[in-house]
C-alpha cells in the first residue's frame, strides 16, 4: 500500500476517534428545571449523533437525541441547545421522580463508527443552582476571564499594574 494512503487513512481514523470525545457532563438547577451540560471535542467534519438518557430502576429512558427514539412522556418537558462543542439539555419541572443516572452519548458514523459517553448521578437535594458566574466561567475563554478579573481588581484598587 502507498505510504501516503496509509498515513491519510491513519489520520482519518485518529481524527474520528477524537472527533466526539465527551469531556464533561455537569448538572445544575435553573428554577425548577434540570440543566445538563455535555461538553465535547469536535475535530471531525462528520455529523455527530447524540443522545441524552436517564437510567432509573435499571430501566433506560431516552430523553432526547438522534440515536434513539425519545420517550413520549419526556418530549414536552425537554429542550435541547446544541453548539459545536456543547449540548445542553433542559428538563422542565424536575422532581425526585426524575432522579437517577443521566448519560450523554455521542457517536460519529462512518467506516469506523466511534462513540463516547459520560454519566452523572443526579439527586435533587444535592444539585447546585446554576449561577451567572458559573455560566460566565463555562462559556468564556480563560484569557478573557482573566483580563476581566484584572480590570475589576485594578478598578477597586485591589491591585495596581
UniProtKB/Swiss-Prot annotation:
InterPro entries: Ig-like_dom, Ig-like_dom_sf, Ig-like_fold, Ig_V-set, Immunoglobulin_dom, THY1. GO terms for molecular function: enzyme binding; GPI anchor binding; GTPase activator activity; integrin binding; protein kinase binding. Abundant in lymphoid tissues. Residues 131-161 form a propeptide. It is a lipid-anchor; GPI-anchor. SUPFAM superfamilies: Immunoglobulin. Residues 20-126 form the Ig-like V-type domain. It is found in: Cell membrane. Keywords: Cell membrane, Disulfide bond, Glycoprotein, GPI-anchor, Immunoglobulin domain, Lipoprotein, Membrane, Phosphoprotein, Pyrrolidone carboxylic acid, Sialic acid, Signal. Its main location: membrane. Disulfide bonds join 28-130, 38-104. One of its GO terms (biological process) is heterotypic cell-cell adhesion. Glycosylation is tissue specific. Sialylation of N-glycans at Asn-93 in brain and at Asn-42, Asn-93 and Asn-117 in thymus. SMART domains: IGv (SM00406). May play a role in cell-cell or cell-ligand interactions during synaptogenesis and other events in the brain. This is Thy-1 membrane glycoprotein. The gene is Thy1.
Amino acid at each position: 500500500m502507498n505510504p501516503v494512503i496509509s498515513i491519510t487513512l491513519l489520520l482519518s481514523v485518529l481524527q474520528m476517534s477524537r472527533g466526539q470525545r465527551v469531556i464533561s457532563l455537569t448538572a445544575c438547577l435553573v428554577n425548577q428545571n434540570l440543566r445538563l451540560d455535555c461538553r465535547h471535542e469536535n475535530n471531525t467534519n462528520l455529523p455527530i449523533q447524540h443522545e441524552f438518557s436517564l437510567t432509573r430502576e435499571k430501566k433506560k429512558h431516552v430523553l432526547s437525541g438522534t440515536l434513539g427514539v425519545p420517550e413520549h412522556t419526556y418530549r414536552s418537558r425537554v429542550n435541547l441547545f446544541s453548539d459545536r462543542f456543547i449540548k445542553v439539555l433542559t428538563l422542565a419541572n424536575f422532581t425526585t421522580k426524575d432522579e437517577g443516572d443521566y448519560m450523554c452519548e455521542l457517536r460519529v458514523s462512518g467506516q469506523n463508527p466511534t462513540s463516547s459517553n459520560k454519566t452523572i448521578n443526579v439527586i435533587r437535594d444535592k444539585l447546585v443552582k446554576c449561577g451567572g458566574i458559573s455560566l460566565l466561567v463555562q462559556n468564556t475563554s480563560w484569557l478573557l476571564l482573566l483580563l476581566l478579573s484584572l480590570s475589576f481588581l485594578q478598578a477597586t484598587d485591589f491591585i495596581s499594574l
